[in-house]
Amino acid sequence: MKLPNEIEEYLVSRNFSENTRSNYYYDLVYLQAFFEDKSVTEEALELYKHQLSKLSPAAQRRKISSANQYFLFLYENKKINQFFKIKQVVQKKTQSSESYHPMIKEFPEFYGPLSCPGQFLALLILEFGLNFAEIQKLKWENFNWNFKYLTIEKAGIKRVLPIREKFAIRVKAIKNADELFAKSRQFLYTELKKFTNYSSKEIREQYILHQVKAGKTIYELANLLGLSTITTLEKYYR
């Protein structure tokens, strides 16, 4: 069975940012080129995986993840009559000096009754992975409480982030959020510090860790965070 070229259709069907779309595009063009003169078989998939072994482990995992999502799309849309999946590369254990595995925290204290601006800021960072610069650009109208999503625009790219109910029930009654969003970075820093000893960077990292644990690919996570590259996220996928 030949591999049909449905790359454009696949990308159109996904709500990717321009950068994420570009990453998927090049991964899939690489896949398509390999199968140009080959049939899709389990043996051919093993050959493809072997070819990827020349790349870094992180690059191998990204290309395999992209290929597997594409195969699923083709199968679900009846473009191929058999579902194929490439087995992910085994993540080799590295020395402790090279590995990076911070502990995931739940922060139950963040989800008590809303008591101060610092708590609201902590929730924004933990729930959406926002930094102070992004919080300063927020408007209360960006929160759609009916359909539970937050719209953020950065560098001309819109991100639509889901709002969890445990966040909504604690903050949607706020009346003066725009006043907080208009404050200086120093003000936001001070208010957060009044509420918790954790820095905005530490809380944002917890958002990243929870998304990795939930199974988000490195490209999907970069899209959620509005990042133009995946470089800063690679350490979480080693």
Curated annotation (Swiss-Prot):
Domain Tyr recombinase span(s) in chain numbering: 90-238
Gene Ontology cellular component terms for the protein in this record: cytoplasm
PROSITE patterns xrefs: CB, TYR_RECOMBINASE
Location(s) in or outside the cell: Cytoplasm
Residue stretches making up the Core-binding (CB) domain: 1-75
Active site: 154, 204, 236 (o-(3'-phospho-dna)-tyrosine intermediate)
Protein keywords: Cytoplasm, DNA integration, DNA recombination, DNA-binding
GO molecular function: DNA binding; tyrosine-based site-specific recombinase activity
Chief site of localization: cytoplasm
Keyword Signal: no
One record GO biological process: DNA transposition
Function: Putative tyrosine recombinase. Not involved in the cutting and rejoining of the recombining DNA molecules on dif(SL) site.
Family: Belongs to the 'phage' integrase family. XerD-like subfamily.
The protein, known as: Tyrosine recombinase XerD-like
Origin species: Lactococcus lactis subsp. cremoris (strain MG1363)
